[in-house]
Amino acid sequence: MKVAVVTFDEYVRTRGPALVRLAWLIAGDRHLGEDLVQEVLSRAYPRWKRIVAGGSPDMYLRRMLVNSHVSWRRKRSSTEVADGGDRVESAGDTDLQARSAERDAMWRLINRLPPKQRITIVLRFYEDLDDASIAEILDCSPATVRTHTMRALTTLRVLHPDPAKETLQ
């Protein structure tokens, strides 16, 4: 989404919540997602004019988020064990507890995917980006994006073999 932005403050005010949600989904942890966004925004602020001049601050910051997450994972102590992440809160559907439970179970499965596959799934199905945009963010070819997506969906189908649900297709 290309947004006409005048100032850094205006951008953060309008797009900040979406960046936090994206980081939360990529990292699988709300607090880590918030930390990633703070880090990315603090690094983006001094070069904001150049970022806006590039024409797509959303794409630039998405890539910064992905790169920051990958760097964090590399630096993380090998003794830490992922706990499966926080629940992704539902915006509504209080009457549909089964649907909410299904969504929570799916996010727990997505959090078990390897980082590149999880990032690809989030960018494809949450951010609704095409292969070329995802490839630009991940600095790889569109074919690699399709491979990550296919492997992630295959893994999710194996981990959650419910043929009655066609949410993955």
What kind of region is each of these model predictions?
Residues 10, 105-113:
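Short amphipathic alpha-helical boundary/capping segments
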Residues 100, 110-118:
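Short helix-coil-helix linker/hinge
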Residues 1-21, 31-34, 45:
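A short, charge-rich alpha-helical start-of-domain segment used by transcription regulators
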Residues 120-124:
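A short pre-motif secondary-structure segment
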Residues 2, 39-56, 75-77, 159:
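Sigma70-family region 2
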Residues 70, 138-162:
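DNA-recognition helix of helix-turn-helix
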Residues 19, 23, 33-44, 61-64, ...:
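Short, small-hydrophobic-rich alpha-helical interface motif
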Residues 46-53, 63-84, 93, 98-99:
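Arg/Lys-rich amphipathic alpha helix in sigma70-family domain 2
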